[in-house]
Structures are given as C-alpha cells and as structure tokens.
C-alpha cells in the first residue's frame, strides 16, 4: 500500500503509543519500531519522518539504547522527544549533563516562534517535563529554540538538516501547544499531505484480502466483540461466501447478546454463520471450580476444542481471520519496555492449526477500529460495544459459576447498562458492568428479614485500559440503578459501587 509513513522509534518510554495516536490524528500513518531497527530496514520503509520517543535511560548508562550516527544523515526529518532529544545531542557530539535536581510536571517554557516547529505559537506557554538529564551544549549546526527556568535547552534545531529535539513531552495533554507542535513537524518540516483515512484503509484492505485469498476458504472465530466483528465484515466484503464465521456461544454472554450477534451477522450482513450452542458443555466443565485462573483456562481450552471440531466439519480451510489490533502487536513485539506480554487472540488458538492468518486490523488502534466499523455500516451500538472479557460472565461471577448466578448477574448488568445509556453516558465511560461477589448479606424487604446476594457495580474512565479511574456517575443515576436491581432481580438485596482506580485494582474483579 502506498502511503506516507512516519516511524516512531521506541526507546522504552511510557507514552510511545500516545505519540503514534497523535500522529494518526493528523491523518498520517505511522508505525512503532524498536530502536534496534537497522538503517537498511529504515531505508526500505522509506519514512517521510522519524520520531524518537522518550525512555527511562540516561545516555551515559552502560546498556543505554543507541542508534547509528548515519541515521541523522539520511535526509529524513527527525524529532527527538526527551531521551530521544538527549540521544540526538549525544550522538552528534553535543553535551548532556546529569544535575542533582530533576524537572518534573507542568512548566512554563519560552519558545522561539521563528522556528518551523513553533510557528504561529505564543512566546511563552505550558509544557510537561519529566527528566533528570538535560542538554548543556547543543551539537555543531544546532541552535536552542526553547528554554525553561531549570532547563537551558528545552528544544533545539538544525533547520538545514531538519533535525529537531524537545526535552518536554508534546504528546501529553499538559503540554498545551503539543498537538500544534507535532502538526508543525508533520506538515511544515516533513511536508506531509495527511491523506490517510479509515475509508481508504478499508478499501485497501479489501483489495489486498481479495488478492491474498483468491478462491480459497476462510474461517473466523466471531465473538461479537468490536475487533472480531470489524475484521469479519472487512473480510466478508472482500470474499463474500468464501468466509464462514464460527460463533461459539458458551452461555457466558450478556443478556440477549448471542441472539444480537446472530441477527446482525446472519441477517444484516448475510454471512455464513455457524452458532454453536455449547452452554451445557461449558457449565459442565466449570462445575465446582471457583479459582479464577482455572476458570479462564477451562474456558480457553474448551473454546479451542469446540472451534477445532467445527472447523474440521467445514473441510478444506486455508485461512483464519483474527481481530488482532496494533497495541497487541506493539505489546508483544518491542523489547524496550520493562514488561512484555505475549499476544494470544481469540482465546489462544493452538499454534498447530494449519491456517494462514488474515489480520486486517493489525495496523489500527481501538478508536480507529471503531471508525472503520462505522465506515463499513456496522450498527453504532455494536461498534461502541463495551469491552468484554473472553471468559465472559464467568469472571464476573466470583466463585463457582452456576446458571442461577449467571441469570442474576445478567439481569443486573442489563439494568445498569440500560440506565447508563438513558443518562447519555455510554460513550463517556470506558467500561461499566455489574458483577456478583461471592457475598450474601442481611436485609429487610417488607416485614421480612432477607439473606441475599450483593451486586457490585464497576465503571471506569480510561483511554487504553492500562490505567483507569473510577467513573463519577451522578448519584441520581446510581440511585435509580440500585432501586431497579433490588426490585427487579430476585435474590439481590444490596448494591455497592466500586471506587478503586487501576492501579491498585484491576478493572475486572477476577
């Protein structure tokens, strides 16, 4: 695919994905690559611009990430951020100093708005600093274009070579001019057009899938979640009836969810859809099991068995569709972060399944996946469907999973979601759900003492689920939810609201 490309070179900073998202907000395609990417690979990718991220290291550290000096002679504009700024200076024979005092938080910065980087900006504004080391002497050919009280070189440039460095973090909201500055780099320095869009992305993917698949058969494990749904629709638009979707209904879905998935994909999109009703099978395997990790493992393994059985019935299948998205690739593919997790999509399908993969969304962030879904005509409600764990309600019913507990959780959750929607909050809260702690408490209903279940409500705000804060839902909404659940759901006499952020808590209770 011919598209303008910006490379975000990863030095282990916490904001790497945010930098990439900021670039893409300007309709410019970018990829995150490790700092170990060779000069040859960079030349082959032919980027129009390069951004160095921040990172936790000092340029003087024994194992500090480095890049080859030749990178700065390729004629490609480079923007270094924080560690990336210091690394540029260090690599080009400037000087980096380690002071006793660090600079952290909101800081006033003086900007030289004659620089292309700060064009049309105020001379003084607010930025976000998070550093110890700083540049005490810029390399030959560079000049200082920003300062703070504590940092003599808050930004530098070699305009002739289109090399720029900033000590602050333009990608975060606290740098008030940050988005504008990145825009200046992309369009004033790199001279990009900004013509990458979700509609062009979908068209290109459909064309590529047609060419890749030919007349072969394809299967997709459809969960009804946003990622697998959008992936399935893209592939279906490319190859039509050559695609068969397998929807394993394990009986652990939310209220009416299985029927909704079947209706949308079978009726609206006219897909070949096999719905496997495996509720009894999954509940049988979960009987007597209360440990959350065992529950997850049992559900994952059983899902694989059911999927394999159905795939074999279809005969000669060449390709498997997965809803892998870009954060999955980044999290499993870079080697600079402190913690790396392996990526297992669709319940951890076995590696010995002899299918070639089709991953149409592997270049997109979640918000971009939603945008493609809207472009493809997937119902708005499904595109904005709440994140839902693979094991489903099994990990929202704490302790042993039974049909009775699932029914209670399902009804309470449906009421909570309904009232959030009525209040116009469904797209303002990242995730919200009801769960059933393994707790019963004393209550009074009428003139009788009761001893019934407690329902916990959980709602969080977040941008990426890595961290989250509890949602400040208006009291009147919580009051209505509480009254409705207690009155409409049997065996419930108490409602609690979880006011814990992540960390220390996780979003899910199990």
Swiss-Prot record:
Q: What is this protein called?
A: GMP synthase [glutamine-hydrolyzing]
Q: Which reaction does it catalyse?
A: XMP + L-glutamine + ATP + H2O = GMP + L-glutamate + AMP + diphosphate + 2 H(+)
Question: What EC number(s) has UniProt assigned to this enzyme?
Answer: 6.3.5.2
Pfam (any one): GMP_synt_C
Alphabetized, the UniProt keywords read: ATP-binding, Glutamine amidotransferase, GMP biosynthesis, Ligase, Nucleotide-binding, Purine biosynthesis
Q: Which residues form the GMPS ATP-PPase domain?
A: 196-385
Q: Where is the active site?
A: 82, 169, 171
Q: What parts of the sequence cross the membrane?
A: none
Disulfide-bonded cysteines? none
What role is this protein assigned?
A: Catalyzes the synthesis of GMP from XMP.
The organism's superkingdom is given as Bacteria
Q: State how it assembles.
A: Homodimer.
